[in-house]
Every structure is written in C-alpha cells, then in structure tokens.
Curated annotation (Swiss-Prot):
Spans annotated as Calmodulin-binding: 167-196
Class of this enzyme: transferase
Keywords, alphabetical: ATP-binding, Calmodulin-binding, Kinase, Membrane, Mitochondrion, Mitochondrion outer membrane, Nucleotide-binding, Transferase
Protein name: Calmodulin calcium-dependent NAD kinase
Cofactor requirements of the protein: Ca(2+)
Source species, domain of life: Eukaryota
Species for this entry: Arabidopsis thaliana (Mouse-ear cress)
Function: Phosphorylates NAD(+) to produce NADP(+) in a calmodulin calcium-dependent manner. Does not possess activity toward NADH. Has broad specificity for the phosphoryl donor, as ATP, CTP, GTP and UTP can be used interchangeably and produce similar efficiencies. May play a role in producing NADP(H) needed to regulate the elicitor-induced reactive oxygen species (ROS) burst by sustaining the activity of NADPH oxidases. Does not seem to play a role in photosynthesis-driven growth.
Assembly and binders: Interacts with calmodulin (CaM) in a calcium Ca(2+)-dependent manner in vitro.
Known catalytic reactions: NAD(+) + ATP = ADP + NADP(+) + H(+)
Gene Ontology CC, one term: mitochondrial outer membrane
Recorded GO MF terms: ATP binding; calmodulin binding; NAD+ kinase activity
EC number of the protein: 2.7.1.23
Length: 534
C-alpha cells in the first residue's frame, strides 16, 4: 500500500531530525568523553608532578609506565623486564631479550636463575663484580617497581605470571572468568563444605600433636614440667610482610626455644589457608586473576581455625607460638586475658565479631567454660602462662614489595590496603601491648640483606627501652596512609624518604648507582650484540 505523499514527506523529515539529534548527541557524548579523559589525564599528570616535586625530579623516571586503555579495559603496566631495561638506559627492551629473560627469572626465582646470570656474564673480564652489580640492580628494580600502582596489584601479579603475548590482546576467557568468579567460588565452597570441616579438624589435631601414635607430652611442655616453670605464650606480631618468619628463625636459635620448639604449638592462620581444601581446589586451577579473591574467601575460616587451635593448646598448658599481625587490639587483648586465666579456668571459642540489627558491635572471641574449675584437677595443676611479645616492623613499602614478590612465588596474595592497615594498627598498638605482657622485644627488618635489628625491649615491670634513632621506624609506620597509591603518598612527609638512613635513599637513590648502571649497560650491549639472532 502506497502512503500519501504528505505523510511520507513528514516521516522523512522526522527521521532527518532524529538523525541530526542523534548525531549531535553522539558528538556531545564524544566531546564529554574526550573532556573527561583529558581532565583525568591532567589530574594524573598533576599528581605525578606533585609527587615529583615532593621527591625531586631526579627519580620521577623510577615509576613504572602505564599504557592507558579504552574505557572498560584495564590498563597495562610496564612489564618488569621492560622496566629493568629502561632503568638501565635501553629504549627498546625487545633488543635485549636475554636481559629480559634473566630479569623475569630473578623476579620469580625460577630454577637455576643464578646460574643463568653467571653464564650470561661468563665472557666478561669483570665477570664477578658484574654478577654482583646485576643482582643488586635487579633487587633495586624489584623494590621500586612494586612501590607504585598499589591499587592495581592484582593486575600486576597476573601480568607478571602471564606470557607477554597474553597481555597484548585481552582474551574472552579473562572476561568470562571474572564474570563467573562468584558462581565458581560458591559451587566449590558448597561441594567441599563437609570435607573442609573434617580436613580442618585433622589439621588442628596434627598441629596440636593429638593425632600422633606416641604421647605428645614431653618434659618440656607437660604439666609435670610446668611445676618447675610456667608455660610460655610467645606472640609474634607485625604487619603482613614485616619479616616475622626471619625473626622467628633467630628466636628458635635461643637456648630456651631451641629445646622447646619441637613440642611447642606454632599457630599461623596462613598455614591453615594453604591446607584449606577450598583454597587448594581454587588455587590448583591456575587462574591468576582469582588469587586475591581466593585468599580472601578463606581468610575468616583460617582465622577461626587458628583461634580454635589456640584455645585448645592453652587449655592443655602447651608452649604456644602465635604468629600473626596482632593488628586488631580487642582480639589481642582478649587473647592475653585468656592466657592469664587459663590455668584456673578452661576456655572455649566465643561468638567472635558480631553486628546486631541495631548496629551494635560485640566482640567475644573466647569465653570461659561453664563447668567449675574444681571439677578439673589437671587445670589446677598448671602454672600461669608467661607471655612474651616479639614485634617486627619495617618501612611499609618494603613489606609491600616483599608481599607482592612472595605472591608471585607461592601464589598467595593480599591487597595492599589491608596490608598497610595491618602495619599501621600494629605500630600504634605495640606500646599498649607491652604493658600487658611479661617481656617484649621489637625488631626492625629494614636492613636489605642484613639481620633484624633489636630497637626496643622490655622485661618484667620495667618501662619500654628504645633505640632513639631506630624507633623512628615505628613512629613512621604508625602515621602511614593506608590509602596510598605509591610510596610518594605513604607518609605525611615524603621528604623523609630521601634522608640518610632511609632504605629508599641508601639503596635506590644511592649516588653510585648511575655509574654502576653505565657499567652494566655497556656490558649488556656487548653480550646481547654477540648473541645469535633468531
């Protein structure tokens, strides 16, 4: 059917008007998008300029480059190997493939990485010194590379663990995995719920020693031995990545713990994460982008398992080493109170952290058992616990770098903000904890490649004695900004990073570095030039 001329003409006119409107709207939207992008870029540049001004323009180039992507696509960070090449003065990292391979191998500590570096330099006259300088430069680059872009730590980890070709074009698989993460996690959690309960119980029995076919009580920790001495609760505290494991190794060499260690109960929430059946099931699938979420999924269950093991060990009068951040004051205070009274009254798990419908918060992590103390003769034979505290602090940017590198190697990661919060909270709480314990020590692990330094100590009722210079580390950490995106935003006064004694100043900004970099770059050019081309 043919439409009347007037109606058809009117329709064409309306379509034309609509087309013009759509065109104008599109142009307006495009202009707005361009303006927003430009404003965002200006803000980014201004932020970088402000950071550069606070630190000095000489080290602005230290920050990794970021390749901006279209809206909805994550940005690509400069790859670590390319970053190393740029720090050594090479404009095109693709011209130095062997160097890039060595840098990645060192970052991930792949098998034989040190032998590969030695082989790479074998024809150089100054082979030994170049070997040392190259590894030192790798270490500097690891520290500086991980001192920026903290909100993109998940992207950074995934990129480091993926092939370079995988980063050029985002795969459909990546989008699908991200979109289905919640459903996948829920399915695995549901399927393994019962198995997890049994597995966690078995793990607790293994750690406590009850599952052994031989009696687990020895002269060191049995109630008979406690007639001669009190059992010991050692609290190892410090932010994530502070270096607690390093300090604990030294403590195990001390006369008391060298004998008591074998029968002591060592409690660490992270250890329960690694044995959690749900965590292992998800981690075994090798999805790098799931790493942070997987650790977060089992965080509460691993914390509960550690708390359950703690109360069991204290009820038995065992020597206990509690290894954790100790960053949540109510939890630590209740733990110490329980340890003070457990020789008189047994305890059990409490309800934990609860928020009522009205918004009221209650925290009850442990509670006394209902039965009378007199009914338990064994409990009356125990001596009061001696409670010792060993704290570990370091500049938080060092801990972030350690944490991300550890994530690359053990495939277990944490977000940077909670990590920074754990450092700040522990630093603020440490003086309060010292008043609640019988003995306290504080170590600083800022020395790169060096041993931990004892910077504060307290024994008995004495006041906390401190090293007046080194205690500044605790003060800095107590005032850090947990929302920092980079090292430049970490402390209220960024200029302290460039002062003598600062790791950043003494390791990264060391005056001899440009000369060493020149020697390395000259040698690398010779070596790469002599390499056969593919």
């Amino acid at each position: 059917m043919v439409k009347p001329l007037g109606e058809g003409t009117r329709d064409v006119s309306n379509v034309g008007c609509k087309s013009v409107d759509l065109l104008l709207a599109s142009l307006g939207g495009l202009a707005a998008a361009v303006a927003a992008a430009y404003a965002g870029e200006l803000l980014l540049r201004r932020r970088k300029l402000d950071q550069g001004a606070s630190m000095g323009y000489k080290d602005v180039k230290i920050a990794p480059l970021i390749e901006r992507k279209d809206s909805g696509r994550r940005s690509n960070l400069e790859r670590f190997s390319h970053y190393v090449a740029r720090q050594l003065g090479f404009e095109d990292p693709n011209e130095y493939p062997q160097l890039c391979k060595l840098a990645n191998g060192y970052l991930l500590k792949t098998k034989g990485y040190d032998e590969n570096v030695d082989e790479y330099l074998e024809n150089e006259a100054e082979r030994d010194s170049l070997y040392v300088h190259l590894l030192e430069e790798f270490d500097r680059c690891i520290l500086t590379y991980f001192s920026f872009n903290w909100t993109q730590s998940s992207n950074l980890i995934s990129q480091a663990l993926s092939d370079e070709s995988d980063q050029k074009v985002p795969k459909l698989k990546d989008f699908v995995m991200a979109a289905t993460r919640k459903q996948r996690f829920e399915r695995v959690t549901k399927d393994l719920k019962v198995k997890r309960v049994i597995s966690t119980l078995v793990e607790e029995m293994r750690v406590i020693g009850s599952g052994s076919s031989e009696p687990h009580c020895t002269e060191v920790m049995s109630p008979v031995a406690h007639n001669k001495r009190s059992p010991v609760l050692l609290l190892m505290g410090g932010g994530m990545g502070a270096g607690k494991s390093t300090v604990l190794k030294d403590i195990f060499l001390e006369s008391f713990w060298s004998e008591a260690q074998a029968d002591a109960v060592v409690i660490e929430a992270d250890a329960f994460k690694e044995t959690d059946v749900i965590y292992r099931a998800l981690s075994s699938r090798g999805h790098h982008d799931d790493m942070l979420q997987t650790a977060e999924l089992v965080h509460q269950s691993s914390t509960d398992a550690a708390s359950s093991l703690l109360v069991t060990a204290l009820n038995d009068g065992r020597d206990v080493i509690m290894d954790g951040t100790l960053s949540w004051e109510p939890f630590v205070e209740q733990m110490i109170e329980m340890a003070r009274n457990v020789h008189k009254q047994k305890y059990r798990m409490g309800e934990g952290y609860k928020v009522s419908e009205e918004g009221t918060i209650t925290e009850k992590y442990w509670e006394e058992e209902e039965e009378e103390t007199k009914e338990n003769g064994k409990q009356q034979n125990l001596k009061p616990y001696r409670i010792e505290l060993v704290g570990v602090v370091c500049d938080a940017y060092l801990a972030v770098a350690r944490g991300i590198r550890r994530a690359l190697m053990v495939k277990r990661a944490v977000r940077v903000k909670p990590q920074l919060n754990s450092h700040k909270r522990f630093a603020n709480a440490f003086p309060k904890y010292c008043e609640l314990v019988d003995n306290a020590r504080l170590y600083c692990t800022n020395a790169v490649g060096g041993p931990p330094r004892l910077i504060a100590w307290k024994d008995g009722n004495s006041k906390l004695l401190v090293d007046p210079e080194d205690i500044d580390c605790l003060k800095r950490v107590s005032s850090l900004n947990p929302d920092a995106e980079s090292i430049y935003e970490l402390y209220p006064d960024p200029s302290q990073l460039s002062k003598p004694g600062s790791v950043w100043n003494d390791v990264v900004l060391v005056p001899s570095r440009p000369k060493v970099q020149k020697e390395l770059s000259d040698a690398i050019r010779r070596i790469e030039k002599a390499q056969p081309k593919n």
